């Protein structure tokens, strides 16, 4: 054989081998759940058009609703939500798994992405990427307030009224590609809506911030989620945004680190629905195994979470007759707040007592601290004036104070003044620096305090995480623990930063974004919308009025 022909044949051989390694494995194991049942045993599929969305204005979409043959309407059914319509031949698989008892009686809701048409019915905007790849809670709110209420109360051909369970343990959500990250985002933001998640070739890449999820999962207190992931070694839809498979590996690693129940199927596929369809029956079996036992929170390997959280303790709600807008720490493991002209004190056990009155035009700034006009008062006595635009204040030891003003007020021996256009202020336990908020950025400002109380060397030092897709909601109240870690109220939770300005832990919220925060003794209080919660911590909050204290440095690592 001539050498040229030989080398040509060798090249052809290796090309064929490489192609075969990337080709689909068409000899996938047979799964009986993929076979259609006879017509009498199949579920019914209903359909409606949703074209009046307030959340995604102008969009039109088809929603399909699968009702299994076993559903009799006598009690609420479990729920499966799937993006992009009926994927995975899901209705056939559900027919089979429900019939064999491997899956509970489950209503399927298959939601297509929105499309906006112009006056001539030409597509002017595809909303899929916006809806599915965004990492905020918008799509979760869309499902909760616009899609699922339309499904509730629908009638089947047999006259059965659809009723959906409101228990997240009875709910599963899934999607492929951008629908995969959408499924995860919904459950991540709203574990009160969904506990079980299946992602196929999930787009955890740099589309609209999904590439940030691995770090955030590692830092966030575990949520009660069970997750099944499928992806292929050759999954790269568009390398501009990243390697899909690499980011799925990063997500799985983060889930394992953070203590989640997670399973995966890595195959030889690329960015396709094929293997996601093959994996769907086993994904459903795994996600629903042990049902109706609850999906539980895991235990994270995050050292900061392990240090600051008290084992077995969770948020406890305190009933409020009227919701305050701000919350302040007291020196006896309690917090104070004002509603109207009344000042209330709340204990860690939930007891609320009236503790004082505000004068006309007076605003509460903390325990015993108020402001009226440009003056600062403590226990009704004026301690400073000329503090125009006074936003926040702390009493320190030795009858000193630190204040935050929106004008160019000046410090004195008695009153230290930070000038900034925000309302968030915290002072380190050793009094050597303070932290102020900075609206519409990811940063908090660290300012050194010299021995004369002068503010020096301010810089954007603390970096906060954000999943709001660019709205950059301003951070709220802040507090230090006795080890110098900073707790910050943000839209995505209480973020806990170390001495070097890095967020190491994020505490999950019981309801909505945190608007107020107070840390006293072992008790962390948070105000979420109009609801107040308290949680016993292992960490101890620092009360500035109790004096400065030293704590070990965390070094520069």
Q: What residue spans do the PLM features occupy?
A:
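Beta-strand-rich domains and repeat architectures in extracellular enzymes and scaffolds
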Residues: 303-304, 314-341
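Short loop/turn segments immediately following beta-strands, especially the blade-tip
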Residues: 447-454, 536-544
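Bacterial N-terminal signal peptides
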Residues: 7-16
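Beta-propeller fold detector
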Residues: 316-319, 353-358, 383-386, 416, ...
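Non-catalytic cap/lid and distal C-terminal segments of serine-dependent acyl enzymes
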Residues: 21-297
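Short loop/turn segments immediately following the C-termini of beta-strands
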Residues: 338-340, 373-374, 404-407, 439, ...
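Beta-rich, blade/repeat-based domains predominating
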Residues: 321-334, 358-375, 385-405, 415-434, ...
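Blade/loop signatures of beta-propeller domains
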Residues: 295-315, 405, 453-455, 544-545
């Amino acid at each position: 054989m001539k050498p040229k022909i030989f080398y040509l044949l060798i090249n052809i051989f290796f090309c064929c081998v490489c192609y075969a390694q990337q080709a689909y494995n068409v000899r996938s194991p047979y799964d009986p759940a993929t076979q259609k049942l006879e017509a009498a045993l199949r579920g019914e599929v209903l359909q409606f058009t949703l074209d009046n969305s307030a959340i995604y204005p102008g969009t039109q979409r088809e929603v399909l609703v699968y009702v299994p043959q076993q559903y009799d309407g006598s009690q609420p059914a479990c729920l499966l939500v799937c993006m992009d319509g009926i994927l995975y031949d899901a209705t056939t698989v559900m027919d089979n798994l429900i019939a064999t008892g491997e899956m509970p009686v489950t209503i399927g809701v298959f939601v297509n992405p929105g499309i906006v048409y112009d006056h001539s019915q030409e597509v002017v905007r595809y909303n899929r990427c916006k809806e599915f790849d965004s990492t905020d809670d918008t799509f979760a709110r869309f499902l909760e307030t616009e899609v699922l209420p339309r499904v509730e109360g629908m009638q089947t051909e047999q006259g059965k009224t659809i009723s959906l369970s409101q228990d997240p343990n009875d709910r599963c959500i899934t999607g492929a590609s951008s629908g995969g990250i959408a499924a995860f985002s919904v459950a991540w933001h709203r574990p009160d809506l969904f506990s079980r998640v299946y992602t196929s070739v999930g787009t955890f890449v740099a589309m609209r911030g999904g590439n940030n999820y691995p770090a955030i999962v590692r830092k966030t207190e575990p949520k009660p989620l069970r997750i099944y992931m499928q992806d292929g070694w050759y999954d790269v839809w568009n390398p501009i945004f990243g390697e899909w498979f690499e980011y799925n590996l990063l997500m799985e690693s983060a889930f394992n680190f953070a203590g989640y129940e997670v399973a995966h199927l890595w195959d030889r596929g690329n960015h396709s629905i094929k293997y996601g369809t093959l994996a769907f029956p086993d994904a459903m079996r795994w996600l629903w195994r042990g049902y109706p036992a609850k999906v539980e929170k895991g235990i994270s390997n995050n050292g900061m979470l392990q240090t600051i959280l008290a084992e077995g303790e969770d948020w406890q709600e305190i009933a409020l007759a009227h919701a305050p807008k701000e919350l302040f720490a007291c020196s006896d493991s309690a917090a104070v707040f004002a509603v109207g002209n009344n000042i209330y004190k709340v204990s860690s056990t939930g007891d609320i007592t009236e503790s004082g009155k505000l004068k006309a035009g007076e605003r509460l700034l903390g325990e015993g601290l108020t402001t009226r006009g440009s003056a600062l008062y403590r226990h009704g006595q004026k301690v400073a004036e000329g503090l125009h635009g006074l936003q926040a204040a702390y009493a320190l030891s030795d009858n000193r104070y630190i204040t935050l003003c929106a004008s160019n007020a000046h410090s004195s021996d008695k009153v230290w003044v930070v000038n900034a256009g925000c309302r968030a202020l915290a002072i380190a336990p050793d009094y050597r620096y303070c932290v102020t908020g900075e609206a519409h950025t990811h940063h908090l400002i660290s300012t050194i305090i010299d021995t004369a109380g002068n503010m020096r060397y301010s810089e954007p030092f603390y970096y906060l995480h954000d999943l709001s897709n660019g709205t950059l909601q301003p951070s709220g109240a802040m507090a230090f623990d006795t080890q110098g870690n900073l707790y910050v109220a943000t839209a995505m939770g209480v973020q806990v930063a170390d001495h070097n300005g890095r967020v190491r832990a994020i505490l999950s919220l019981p309801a909505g974004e945190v608007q107020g925060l107070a840390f006293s003794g072992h008790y962390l209080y948070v105000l979420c919308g109009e609801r107040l919660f308290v949680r016993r911590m292992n960490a101890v909050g620092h009360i500035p009025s109790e004096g400065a204290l030293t704590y070990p440095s965390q070094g520069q690592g």
